[in-house]
Every structure is written in C-alpha cells, then in structure tokens.
C-alpha cells in the first residue's frame, strides 16, 4: 500500500491494487494550532483584519490632519502679540485716541 500525502488539500491518496481511496485529515501546524478548513472562516478573519487596518489608517490620517490645522499655544500667543503690537503702532494709540483724520479742526478757522 502506497500513501501520498497532499499538503495543499489536506487529503492523502492511498492506492492498493488499482483501487484509490481518499481520506480527509485535519490540517495542523507543528504547534498544533487550528487552521481554518473552509474559505468562510478565513474570509471572516481577513474581513476583521482589513477593517481594523482601515480604521487604524483613517485615525492616523485624521490625527495628522488635525495636528497640522489645529492652532497650538505658540500660534495663539504669536497672534495676540502681533495684534497688541499693531494696536500700539496705530496713530490713534500714539496720540491718545485723538481724532487724526481731520488735519484742521474747527477752532483753526
């Protein structure tokens, strides 16, 4: 009796005097861990892994986008400093809030 194992399909073919029989065996690796037997089990596992990877990628992209566009404390401080400097350099601030638009007042006439 000659037995030829087939590792791809999990079956072995035995032949005795022209008759061929097929026996199904359970696929296991060297550590005796379970190997899925049909495509639906593999598909379910792959679907879960793909969804996890997609979610991870989306969250990483969102985090990077928010970090680029989110105003930091340094940005806020710089903006406030620039605004304060701008207020100090305006003519009305220099002249004590006097009206500087009219060169001649009514008193000069």
Curated annotation (Swiss-Prot):
Compositionally skewed regions (Low complexity) per UniProt: 8-22
Q: Which GO terms describe its cellular component?
A: host cell membrane; membrane
Compositionally biased intervals (Polar residues): 91-102
Main localisation, per the record? host cell
Please state where this protein is localized: Host membrane
**Protein keywords:** Host membrane, Membrane, Transmembrane, Transmembrane helix
- Membrane topology reported for the UniProt record: Single-pass membrane protein
Span-the-membrane segments of this chain are 42-62
Q: Where is this region: Disordered?
A: 1-25, 84-109
Protein name, UniProt field: Uncharacterized protein N
